[in-house]
Amino acid sequence: MLLLAAGTALRAQTLGGEYRLSRVFPVEGRQGIAADSNYYYVSGSTVLYKYDKQGRLVARNGQPFEGLPLAANHIGDIDVWNGEIYAGIETFEDGKGENIQVAVYDADDLTWKRSIDWEPASGQVEVCGLAVDRDRNMVWMADWVDGRYLYGYDLATGKYVRKVHLRPVPQWQQGIYMAGGQMLISADDGDADLDEPDNLYIADLRDGKSYATVLPFRMMSDFRRAGEIEGLTVDPATDELLVLSNRGSRIVLGVVRGFYQGYDRCWEWSGVSTRGTTANCTKCMSMKR
């Protein structure tokens, strides 16, 4: 899997209203994707990757849990901001999460720097999606097990701030990304066995209320044999919306349990550009041989 990382200050991002698929390419890692002006960052369940915009591997951390304050075995979604990668990390077994934390890594060499503690009293029991709110200096987490709420933490203090009730609740949330106070949510809510597409949703958090209305944003019907879609992000240099997809993989309780006929690998991603009405979509996926 690939995405871009850098430390260049860029303009505030806004979301487009329409996207079309523009390109597809395979990457390593099947969980999260992040981008800055120069690099792509991708998370596998136990590995972090960094690629340049030409798809060349620049850095790899195969031991991302080394030094963490809590034992962990699973990386979920990621985001990148101000030269740091934020990763939702936990111990994940049989569809349940423990030892939740936001681990922060150096975007240059992918080494761990620090972690933000999880607040159990918030009610969060798992972490799937993660997004940095660049306007309010917060980091948000989503919960795959109980997806009713998004959970926000202050980046300056690391303290839990609040949760937002999603109404209605997208089923099997995977990734989140915030732009201009609006939260994009990817959901593995299509039954891949029946060739049902997964979907993207949007929720407006700008009013600061304890709840937010969730609306359909995009049906990912142009993803073939998606298996499940995962993390998503917007490339700040190109305005492309990038969506990770485990094409060809059969997923049961969040774990790959083999492949559909004609496939022998997974791990792909995709993206979508957001400039004007001609916005396009980029998608990275594992291809059948």
Question: Each predicted region: which residue ranges?
Answer:
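Loop/turn-rich, solvent-exposed surfaces of beta-rich toroidal or solenoidal domains
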Residues: 168-205
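Short loop/turn segments immediately following the C-termini of beta-strands
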Residues: 45, 90-92, 142-146, 188-191, ...
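Blade-loop segments of beta-propeller domains
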Residues: 57-92
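Structural motif
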Residues: 48-51, 94-103, 147-152, 192-202, ...
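Repeated scaffold domains used in trafficking and secretory/extracellular systems
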Residues: 27-34, 69-77, 122-132, 169-177, ...
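Beta-strand-rich domains and repeat architectures in extracellular enzymes and scaffolds
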Residues: 21-46, 74
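Short coil/turn segments that connect the beta-strands within blades of beta-propeller domains
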Residues: 37-38, 82-83, 135-137, 180-182, ...
